[in-house]
Amino acid sequence: SSAAVYKTKDTQLTESDTLSPENFYGETKLKFERLLHWYNRIHGINFVSLRYFNASGAAYGLGENHEQETHLIPLVLQAALGKKDCIKIFGSNYPTSDGTCVRDYIHVLDLANAHLLALENIRETPQTYNVGTGKGYSVREIINIAEDITGKKIFAVDVLAREGDAAYLVADPTKIEKEWGWKAEHDI
């Protein structure tokens, strides 16, 4: 599933927070979660919902390759490498510390570990877990971190916010940490 199923708020999101997607993507994820609950009820099919926050990173040795890249971190790194002239910042008037969206970036290897634990811990009663680090980074913070690491200036331009982009999506991973002993091992 996805963090996109939640109603936006300016603090960490828990599994019991209000479900109210702000975009089509989140709505489809929530509908699928509801379908799984019906399948469990009618057919006894057990499942675990893992609500991802922003997946990032690459598997070591495999890398990452998206055609028509849309993910912030690879775009920022492309700009640092001179493959892009600048980064578009979609919205600079959000109610956040620097006006840009804040996201919780969770490494794909940490997501893989959560999936393995889900297979080991599936029960008759469906469970839902947030899979994130509990730390949020704004778009400008990601750009600044990339500049610090690469030593390159990354140019950015503010453009209009995209419809349905939440201001703040950061996980409260307490439930998965306590119940399964899972914790993100990678940071930004």
What function would you assign to each model-found segment?
Residues 70-73, 107:
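C-terminal catalytic core of Y-nucleophile DNA break-rejoin enzymes
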Residues 2-5, 57-60, 94, 120, ...:
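Active-site proximal helix/loop that lines the substrate pocket
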Residues 60-62, 100-101:
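Short acidic, glycine/proline-rich loop/turn micro-motifs
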Residues 1, 48-54, 104, 130-132:
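Structural signature of the Rossmann-like NAD(P)-dependent dehydrogenase/reductase core
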Residues 4-54, 61-71:
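Catalytic helix-loop patch of NAD(P)-dependent Rossmann-fold dehydrogenases
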Residues 78-188:
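C-terminal substrate-binding subdomain of Rossmann-fold SDR/epimerase-dehydratase oxidoreductases
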Residues 2-4, 51-54, 91-93, 173:
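Short, small-residue-rich loop/turn micro-motifs
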